Amino acid sequence: MTSKTNMTSNKFAYDFFPWSNDTNSSQQIKNIKPPPKRSNRPTKRTTFTSEQVTLLELEFAKNEYICKDRRGELAQTIELTECQVKTWFQNRRTKKRRCTSPLRKSMMKKSDERSPSPQNPSSQHVQNLQTFFHSWPSHFAYSLPSDQQNNV
């Protein structure tokens, strides 16, 4: 009785999966080799020259996302692979987000409060701009109209 059920189940398998009984396909499966194992060594880190970084930064300043065509041109110009340029842009966007995050700003504010400095550099910059703009008309051959002339 058991042999009859085995035959029925085999016929079922053969009807739905005819390749399962094919010796040629099972031989092909045995010949498939797994992909080669990666070595335990880490991949070599790319060291960019100052010229490469300058050109990459200039391109990033124009556009944070580089299209495929421009990436190819830039990669060829600075003698890098497209993958290296793409990765540099990804890392640079991450760096920008990290540097402009609210958490980082709050940490910077706390560190500014801790370190005694005679004057905050940003406030010094604002004062320099104010001084420049107060004396601005004297830098030019013509003078700007005064408030009295506008009221006449």
Swiss-Prot record:
InterPro entries: HD, HD_metazoa, Homeobox_CS, Homeobox_TF, Homeodomain-like_sf. Residues 35-44 have a biased composition (Basic residues). PROSITE patterns: HOMEOBOX_1 (PS00027), HOMEOBOX_2 (PS50071). Residues 21-30, 116-126 have a biased composition (Polar residues). The keyword DNA-binding applies. Residues 21-48, 92-126 are annotated as: Disordered. Keywords: DNA-binding, Homeobox, Nucleus. One of its GO terms (cellular component) is nucleus. One of its GO terms (molecular function) is DNA-binding transcription factor activity, RNA polymerase II-specific. CDD domains: homeodomain. Its main location: nucleus. It comes from the Eukaryota. It is found in: Nucleus. Residues 41-100 bind DNA. May interact with homeobox protein ceh-14. Probable transcription factor, modulating expression of helix-loop-helix protein mbr-1, perhaps acting in concert with homeobox protein ceh-14. May play a minor role in axon guidance in the DVC interneuron. This is Homeobox protein ceh-63. It comes from Caenorhabditis elegans.
